Regions:
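A generic structural signal for ordered alpha-helices
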Residues: 1, 18, 32, 178, ...
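Generic hydrophobic-segment detector
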Residues: 5, 38, 90-93, 157, ...
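Primarily NTPase-proximal linker/entry elements flanking Walker-type ATP/GTP-binding cores
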Residues: 10, 14-131, 136-181
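Short beta-strand segments
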Residues: 99-100, 182, 216, 270
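Conserved catalytic-core segment of NTP-binding enzymes
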Residues: 160-174, 188-292, 297
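Short glycine-rich anion-binding loops that position phosphate/pyrophosphate groups of nucleotides
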Residues: 184-186
Length: 300
């Protein structure tokens, strides 16, 4: 558990530093003045906390400081209450299809996800259905070899749906625990590419109804992430999110908006380049990591 919290802390360090420094500045003040509230509002919105939750937090922060409930605790309580009705991650299905726009770290996430399940003792197959990029197929092949995972790739086929069908079919025949399918990055405004993705999902669904569709979202994209997910969901039923590049952003609050506005659970956060830098998402660890310093979060 401590390892999970530390990984989450690492991924949210930039966001946490800004918020923690601000709350430290407020320490000792019984009441925050208008300039304090304005600075807090700017910081929360800059972290992509979202306007609705920011308003709720500001309302709580305007109340006089109480020794029995610190401002930090009230901050956490606001987020917990705000997210009390959102779906939480469940056990993922056998087949996991990863989708997303270009540059979100999707192919790397496929490999990391494979490593995660393999480390848990599960048999895993990677399916290289990003047929538009030879480099992506080679990247998956290298990862599969390095992690000792099964692989389905077809250098001669340009039809991603065909590769996906073969990969999932082979994995089911071999009774593997997980089959993780990579797809090419696509602009969510391109109807033709999105319909192709729809076809990939359709052919996989003919083989099994145990399919999860996770969208990889670059945490740095902020509000654009919401629009990306909405567009993808028009063509394919998204069941969850992998937030990538969390270690490089000060906008870690975007996870809150994704969960609340899209009602999609966040399953993993990418917090680095190594294969084990894909962290299972824990709402409790996430909320603690937004504001508390490392020793407090680990010991709290």
């Amino acid at each position: 558990m401590i390892s999970l919290i530390k990984k989450t802390l690492s991924g949210l360090s930039k966001t946490r530093t800004k918020l923690s420094n601000l709350f430290a500045k407020f320490s000792g003040k019984s009441i925050l003045d208008d300039s304090d509230i304005e600075e807090l509002e700017e910081t929360l919105l800059g972290a992509d906390i979202g306007w609705e939750l920011t308003e709720s937090i500001l309302e709580k922060m305007r109340e006089p400081d109480k020794k029995e409930v610190s401002r930090e605790e009230r901050f956490q309580q606001c987020i917990q209450q705000y997210l009390s009705d959102v779906d939480q991650p469940r056990d993922l299905h056998k087949v996991i299809l990863l989708v997303g726009i270009n540059g979100t770290g999707k192919t790397t996430s496929v490999a990391k996800l494979g490593g995660y399940f393999s480390n848990a003792g599960e048999s895993v197959s990677l399916v290289a259905a990003d047929t538009y990029r030879a480099a992506a197929v080679e990247q998956i092949r290298i990862w599969a070899t390095r992690l000792n995972l099964h692989l389905t790739a077809n250098d001669k086929s340009a039809d991603p749906a065909s590769v996906a069908f073969d990969g999932v079919s082979n994995g089911i025949t071999k009774n593997l625990d997980r089959i993780i399918v990579d797809t090419s990055g696509r602009v969510h405004t391109s109807a033709n590419l999105m319909k192709e993705l729809e076809k990939i999902y359709r052919v996989i669904s003919k083989l099994t109804d145990e399919v999860d569709v996770l969208i990889t979202i670059d945490a740095n994209t902020g509000q654009n992430a919401l629009q990306q997910a909405r567009e993808f969901s028009q063509y394919i039923p998204l069941t969850g999110v992998i937030l990538t590049k969390m270690d490089g952003t000060a906008r870690g609050g975007i996870a809150i908006q994704i969960m609340k506005e899209l009602n999609l659970p966040v399953y993993f956060m990418g917090v680095g380049e190594q294969v084990d830098d894909l962290v299972p998402f824990s709402l409790d660890s996430y909320i603690k990591s937004l504001i508390l310093m490392e020793t407090e979060a680990v010991n709290g």
